[in-house]
């Protein structure tokens, strides 16, 4: 600990004798920024939120001495991160030292820029940070390299620009529910994705529409200031063409072109939709009790009770102007027990038949049994069932499967060690066994099976030892081949892989360099 009443941690030794013997630990130091210093200096920025997508960012002089807290953290292999925080504890800079060439440090800086309300408005990656100088940052550079964000009056993310793609827009209602979104490709087609909630914020309708919306002048937020009671949601009334839902107020007032393409319809709280949709004459969607499985509750308040999904070819019809509101849906109905757990689902399938699933649980809610029964158009019934077993810590130890009337098969049989780690897995009645080994830090060190064997080395083996979790070398053999094959790995100062050198034999010195991989460089995004 630090030699002060604050008792801050300055060094941390994690488990492992080899780390202790080699003096490998995590180190934490704290400094303040120093203007003009190549390691502890940090640029300041001025941000002006312009009209629409415009973001004007200029580089001002560096922060005054002592105005930022700098935390230097170093892992067990000396890889270092400097994190600069302002007085509001916001991270304004993350600095990594990539290399030192001829006495000059090659820095990898990521700057974070906030507005007056503390919202993150821009992230400048190292590719852009390397080009910074005092003055305005050219708009074309921000457009090419910057991660840019703009917010509406309610503080919701309204527009986002990532490198290499167009702006993405987001539109919210007065409850801060996302109701419309659009990416660059959708903008070319004049389309918006919509996700309309009910009064409780639960998504009821999802799909695509062509509607005239300006995300920078969001009409759906105006009730916040005008005192109107229109929340711009949808409500189930049971008699409209949108799966029984009705849009509130002027939610689709800016609609242009065809009617909205509703791709997903969600129903909640009850099963009234079954009597007012295509399901009204289909008794096969009704609840059917199955002995040994959970019974349904008389109330489904607050639960998702039904889903209707439009056939996948409807979107192509919509784009070609051929879509009609009578396009077919596939339905699923969900039933729950008195503890709100899924007890039964009923769905129609692409074969013209039905799928029905039954579930049962233990006291803690772990699934014990699952029965799946499918019928095709010819009323042929296929069924398969699953049974699950758990240990005292509620870890899955066995999963069994039965297809029709065939003999039950043990799909998986898991064994755990005293630390709760998976140590052995057996498949299909013991036909295939796989064992796993770990080091003191629970890093995977070996996989041993009947057809494959692999060993991972971190601090041991024949390669350069790494103590921070990077793999130093690995060897493997497969099938009946007794030849051990493997790679030695090396990394740069940012923990990025630079070389993978191939070899064979127990120490990888035979047939070297046959399948080497060399990374000559990384971008700085």
Describe each PLM feature range:
Residues 1-490, 496-524:
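Beta-strand elements of repeat-based all-beta scaffolds
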């Amino acid at each position: 600990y630090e030699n002060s009443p604050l008792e801050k941690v300055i060094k941390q030794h994690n488990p492992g004798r080899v780390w202790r013997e080699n003096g490998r630990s995590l180190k934490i130091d704290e400094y303040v920024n120093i203007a003009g210093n190549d390691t502890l200096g940090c640029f300041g920025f001025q941000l002006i939120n312009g009209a629409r997508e415009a973001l004007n960012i200029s580089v001002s002089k560096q922060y005054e001495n002592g105005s930022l807290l700098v935390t230097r953290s170093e892992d067990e292999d000396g890889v270092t991160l400097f994190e600069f925080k302002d007085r509001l504890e916001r991270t304004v800079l993350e600095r990594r030292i990539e290399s030192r060439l001829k006495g000059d440090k090659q820095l990898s800086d990521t700057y974070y820029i906030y507005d007056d309300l503390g919202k993150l408005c821009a992230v400048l990656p190292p590719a852009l940070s390397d080009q910074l100088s005092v003055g305005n940052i050219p708009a074309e550079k921000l457009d090419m390299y910057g991660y840019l964000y703009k917010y509406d009056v309610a503080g919701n993310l309204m527009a986002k620009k990532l490198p290499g793609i167009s702006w993405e827009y987001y539109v919210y209602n007065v409850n801060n529910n996302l109701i419309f979104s659009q990416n660059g490709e959708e903008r070319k087609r004049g389309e918006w994705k919509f996700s309309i909630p009910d009064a409780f914020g639960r998504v009821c309708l999802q799909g695509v529409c062509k509607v005239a919306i300006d995300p920078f002048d969001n009409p759906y937020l105006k009730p916040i200031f005008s005192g109107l009671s229109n929340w711009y949601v949808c409500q189930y009334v049971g008699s409209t063409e949108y799966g029984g839902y009705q849009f509130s107020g002027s939610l689709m007032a800016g609609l242009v072109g065809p009617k909205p393409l509703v791709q997903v319809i969600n129903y909640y709280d009850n099963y009234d939709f079954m009597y007012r949709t295509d399901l009204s004459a289909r008794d096969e969607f009704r609840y059917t009790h199955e002995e040994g499985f959970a019974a349904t509750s008389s109330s489904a308040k607050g639960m998702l009770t039904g889903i209707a999904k439009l056939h996948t070819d409807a979107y192509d019809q919509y784009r070609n102007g051929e879509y009609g509101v009578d396009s077919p849906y596939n339905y699923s109905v969900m039933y729950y027990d008195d503890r709100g757990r899924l007890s039964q689902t009923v769905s129609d399938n692409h074969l013209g038949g039905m799928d029905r699933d039954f579930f049962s649980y233990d006291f803690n809610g772990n699934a014990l049994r699952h029965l799946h029964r499918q019928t095709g158009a010819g009323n042929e019934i296929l069924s398969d069932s699953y049974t699950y077993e758990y240990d005292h810590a509620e870890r899955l130890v066995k999963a069994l499967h039965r297809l029709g009337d065939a003999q039950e098969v043990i799909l998986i049989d898991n064994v755990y060690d005293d630390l709760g780690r998976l140590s052995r897995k057996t498949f299909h009645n013991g036909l295939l066994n796989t064992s796993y080994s770990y080091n003191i830090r629970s890093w995977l060190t070996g996989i041993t099976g009947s057809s494959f064997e692999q060993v991972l080395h971190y601090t041991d083996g024949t390669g350069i030892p790494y103590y921070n979790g990077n793999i130093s070398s690995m060897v493997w053999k497969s099938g009946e081949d007794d030849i051990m094959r493997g790679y030695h790995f090396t990394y740069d100062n940012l923990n990025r892989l630079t070389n993978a050198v191939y070899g064979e034999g127990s120490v990888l010195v035979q047939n070297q360099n046959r399948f080497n991989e060399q990374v000559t460089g990384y971008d700085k995004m």
